[in-house]
Structure formats: C-alpha cells, structure tokens
Amino acid sequence: MNFFANAKENFVTESIDGLRRASGDPSIATLDGYPHIKVVCRTDLPSSKVAIISGGGSGHEPSHAGFVGKGMLTAAVCGEIFASPSFDAVLAAILTVTGKAGCLLIVPNYTGDRLNFGLAAERARALGKKVEMVVVSDDIAIPGIAQPRGVAGVLFVHKIAGYLAEKGANLATVAAAARSVAAKSVTLGISLSSCTLPGAGREDRVPPGQAELGLGIHGEPGVEMIDFSGAKAAADILCDRLFERVGKASGYALLLNNLGSTMLLEMGVLANEFLSSANGRKIKLIIGPSLMVTSLDMHGFSASLLPLTRDYITALTAPVAPRAWPSPRTPARLKRLKLPKEVKSTASKPSRNDAAAAFIAKSCDLLMALETELNALDAKVGDGDTGSTIATGARSLKSHLSKLPLADNPSLLASISDLLGKSMGGSSGVLLAIMFAAAGQALKAGVSLPAALQAGLERMKEIGGAKTGDRTMIDALEPALAALAGGKSLSAAAALARQGADATAYMTRAGAGRSTYVSSANLKGVPDPGALAVARLLEGLA
C-alpha cells in the first residue's frame, strides 16, 4: 500500500512540521531535538499558569500535537508511529514549558506511555519541578481488566484541564479535576477493518459482513467479532454498552470520533443514529463527528461519554486556539419546511392497462438485474454508479406502477419523467426526465409513440449537448428509436442498439459525461455503461 510520504524515518517529523505550519499559530514551536525528541509546545504560557502536557505514539493525528494551543495542551510529546516517546523526550517537554505553577501530565493508559511519562515525572521532580500525573483509562471494551486502555476520552481531560489551567487554577485543583474527568469518561469503538502500518501489508482481520468491537487504536484485536448489519445496529450496541457503564447524570457529552478512514457521509449517519436512539435525548452536547483520536486508516469510529455538570459544560464549550478541537454543540431538533407547491408531484389519476404494466415491470426487472455489472463497468470509465443510478430509477418506477396513468400514454410519459427526475439523481436521471417529458408533449400533438420518443431524444440532445459518437447512451438509443419509428421490429431495434453500444468500446474520446475526464487508454475496449444498458434492455424485451 502506498502513502503520501517521503523517507519512512522522516514521516512523523515532516508531518508535525507541515501541520504546525498549516495551523497558522505563531505561538506554537517544536523543540530542536529531531528526530529523537519530537515535542510540539506553546511559547506563550506565563510561568504563573499550570502547563498541561500529553502525548504518545504518532498515527493518531490530530492527537496529540493538534491539540496544542491556548485553552488546551501546552505541549505534546510525539513518539514514532504507535511507539511511546522516550522518557528524555517527555523530560525535555516538562523542562521547557513548566514554570513555577508546575505541570500536569495527562497520559493515555498504555504501558510504554505510563512508564516513560512516569520516569520523566520523577526526574523532573528531582530537578525541582512540581509535577502531577493523571492516567486516563476510559476504554470499557474488556470488562474487569486491571489496566483499561486510554482512548478518545482523554480529550475530555485535555479540554477541562486546559480550561482550568488557562483560568489560573493551581496545580492541585487542575490535577483533581483531571482525575475526576478521567474516572467518569467511558469510550467504546467498533471497526470494519484494522489499520495499515506504513511499510507493512494490509491486515484483513475483519471478515466481510462482520465488525470488530472494542479493538485498540494500535490495531490490537478487539473483544469480539459481531455480525455487521448497518449503522443503526453499530450505534445501538455502542450506545447501550456505554450508557450501562457511565455514571448517572441528567445529561451527557458525546464525543463521536472517526478512527481514520470512515467517510463523513457515514459519520453523519452515525451521529443521526446516536441522537435518535433511546438514550439520544440524554445527550446535551455533541463533539464531532470528527477526526480526533485516530488509528491511521482504520475504518471505524468510537464514541465517548462524559456525565455533565454545569462546570464541565462551561469548560468544554469555552473557545480554544487549536483548530483540531470541534466546538461542542447542543444537538439541534430537526426542522423541515414545506415544499413549494410547484415542486410537488404532478402525478395524474391512476388508470389500468395490464399490458403496459407488464411491459414496464419487465423493463424495470431487466434494468435492476444489471446493477452490479454496470457499476463494475462504470468504475473503469466513470465514478462507478451507473448501475445503481439506473436501478434506483427502475425500483422507483416499479414501486409506483399502481399509481400510474397506464391507460393514458401522454400522462404516463409525463409521470415517468417526474419519477425518474426525482428518484435517479445525477445527469442520467435528468436527461431521461427531459426525454420522457418532451415525448409526452409530442404524443399529445398526435404523433406515434416511437416518433414521440424520437422527439424526446432530440430534446435530450439539445439540452444535454451530447450526440451520436460522443460515447453515451445516445449511441445505442438513437439508432434503436429510428428503427422503431421506421416500422422495424423490436428485435431489429435491439440489434442496432447493440451495434451502437459495442461501437462505444472503440471510441477513445468521450464527448459528454464523466468519461470526458478519463484517459483514452482507460476508455479503449470498455463500452459505455449507459449505452450497454439500453442495448441489454431492448434485447431483454425483444
């Protein structure tokens, strides 16, 4: 697997430098200790304020370096990928940023981190520094374990301790608050994959159709494999287990964390499921969904809960400098406005025609059966969704059969236009809607059905800008409709559609559609998916 990196040994340091530059914060610096000592720190903290230091292995970005800045961390100590920073790197951070007010070390509970931060704390104390250390163990994946892992809940501790330190609280107060928050935070994660270490092969530990519950942020195996049945089930199992373990309160903060490669589209669905769940009304603040404590490219997410108090709400919602911290929000109630009446369906009165119903149903079945094949073909020359787009339109049309004006062809074509325009999406849905709408108008003028469809095709070409030879569905549709308008059989039309579709495989330049952005080498030998769909439909109907 390839990565956007240069030399492997410089992966972490170059990333730190790039992200630090992109932050635009002139008060953030790194210690001059590369490559062994990788410390990101503030330069503007008065010695009268408690310094907040955290860190651990890299590969969890933006944690922890991304949270350095006013209102959160004073320094972050970075190890190599999934490796604890050395004690002298931690000590260097302590000695650099700790003033007379002392410092608090916030340590996710992993053996290497705990030992190296602990040893550095002892050395710093021997040098006269006031140092407190809090170990965060928020992972509830394995019940009864002696040393639960520290995962995304550590951010609750960063934020609240950082707030108190910025306000000028003394070390004892900041440390006590941090310990209290750490003890109350609970986190659980679930993933559809492990993660890929740079230079190593991808591990396919999670079988298709399953998800791993409670795996660690270093890719450690989870507590169990479960059947995966979608976002709702995944959100429900995490929500149920978290609320079983978290302390009682009138409201909670939910931190919804992307573990690396989960799409924002997926994270939006998950946020909706958490907030719509039986316990959703108890969530008074939501942080994310966002990348916060990641595990390289892991396809999963974690959820963390913290019982809220008035003081916690104040601390969590206080503005901070680090851009990686997503401002907590009070969940909004869904508000829906009425559609303008002009946009509502223009459906005509339903009527019965068994032959038309059977013809449309068979057409829809033929198109739905092509979904996987067309998607695979489109993945080579487009964005891989032609089959799904066409199948969506076919499913919508078939599901509305009983509501269509089947005995009134002009109204039927207008209704098909309305349905396809609303259900299919993408350019193809709009183009077909244009064609059927124009065909319906032509039928009203008294022309035959094939001639009306030809008129619809001409309008589609006029508005869409494509023509025969541009490697689109028109290459199959135009000769087929011309044959039907000329009195030829459906079989003859299907044969011409097939010739047109096959010809697109030898067109090395596309004049319209997504394929216009694809190189000639990739187009060669691959027929246009839309043209093939037309040919296969007519062949199935002939």
Where do the model's predicted regions map?
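N-terminal loops that bind phosphate or other acidic moieties
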Residues: 1-542
